[in-house]
Amino acid sequence: MIEAQGLIETDRLATLSVNGSGSLFWDSVASLYTSVYVWIPLALVAVFLIIRNVNPRRILLVLFLLAVTVLLCDQLSSSVCKPLFHRLRPTHDPNILNMVDTVNGYRGGLYGFFSGHAANSFGLAMFFVLLVKHRWFSLSVLIWAFLNSIIRTYLGVHFVGDIVVGAVTGMLIGSITYWIYSMFARKDKKSIDVRGSSLLYTRSGFMRSDVYLFISVLFGTYSVILILSCFN
């Protein structure tokens, strides 16, 4: 019990160290970053990446498993763990709620363990990392997932521990759904893609030009968020 209480206190301190900044600019950045709408262009490019580079026989399977990844992460968080563990969000924790900075008065629901945002983000990121197999792409999507997750702590609606458990859970689910995909791909011998130069294609046969397009749109979105935040 003493060790558990120590972990809880450490988690609270870590959370308060990440939460808020007193800056309207960074508050705006955090708010925009967690908006679904700002990521629509990147989502469209991700679908384009799949359609252009995955064998037509497996495109629907990939899209289906991506949806399953999100569904499993979301439901395990919201329908199983949050009602089961009843861990209050920082914004509702009586021990620290008066010390937590919020943005636009947003406090989230009552319970926050574990973070569905972190699980979804890392679940999708892990699936894409294993699917595309490109170093800079992998680094880019993992950074995206990390930022998408830790910003929830900045906003005060998740403890750092919620984020860590959500991230690990998401990566596990993303790995499992990709494994399911790989089993189907191995059975479908006719769908094996043989690509040419490694300068043009990743190890999994994705065109590097398409991968770099995705990365460019990702960092372009970061730039748009920063620019828009200057005027909010």
Please describe what each predicted stretch is.
Residues 1-42, 77-107, 228-232:
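N-terminal transmembrane-helix/juxtamembrane module of multi-pass inner/ER membrane proteins
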Residues 34-50, 64, 117-120, 140:
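Hydrophobic alpha-helical transmembrane segments
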Residues 40, 63-71, 75, 163, ...:
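Alpha-helical transmembrane spans of integral membrane proteins, capturing the lipid-embedded, hydrophobic core
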